[in-house]
Amino acid sequence: MNRIKAVVLDLGNVLVFHDDLVLFQRLSAWGGAAPEHIRKRMLELWDAINRGSLAGDELRRAVCRVAGSEVPMDAEAFYALWNCHFRVHHEILPTVDALFGRVKVILLTNVNEMHWRFVRPLIAQFERFDDLVISCDLRLAKPDPEIFQATLARSTLRPEETAYFDDVPRYIEVARALGIQARVFTTAPTFRTQLAELGVVV
């Protein structure tokens, strides 16, 4: 097995938890559309949101329409509601701390500008990451292989020397097809075990 030189981490449900049902329920309470209706309609929007092609006031108006209102809430209220469903996954952070100095630590995430602006200050460790690969900045999003290739290229990494952790199996499959040592993330203890199996003992 090749020695792992970099660990690439997803954001949602790895470093932070995000309960989309909470978001949809809050949007429902504000706009009147049913949470399930909101969930289904948002499925049509997430790719554009993650790629940054739907952003800012346009994003706010689109989400408010999905919630059932042609009149959008004001920007400050929307920002608070749009970020209501995040909480830091504190249990994983000591393991992340232990990776610094051993391997490169990189973030690769599908995220929009407003979510990233809210989440980034919550985790001080981001200041120590070797790279932060943000989908809306690149105008690329998982599962597009290009965003994985861009992540490798930006840090001059070989895929076989790169470990990648994500909670979405479909993204793991794409990464593996590119030769990346990808694993489905489930829990912090399992993450430590997976690292050890890859030769990264922390």
What label would you give each PLM region?
Residues 1-5, 9, 112-113, 117-202:
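Asp-based, Mg2+/Mn2+-dependent phosphohydrolase catalytic module
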Residues 99-100, 176:
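Anion (oxyanion) recognition and catalysis
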Residues 109:
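Conserved phosphate-coupling serine/threonine residues in phosphotransfer and NTP-handling enzymes
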Residues 93-97, 172:
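Short amphipathic alpha-helical segments and helix-helix/interface helices
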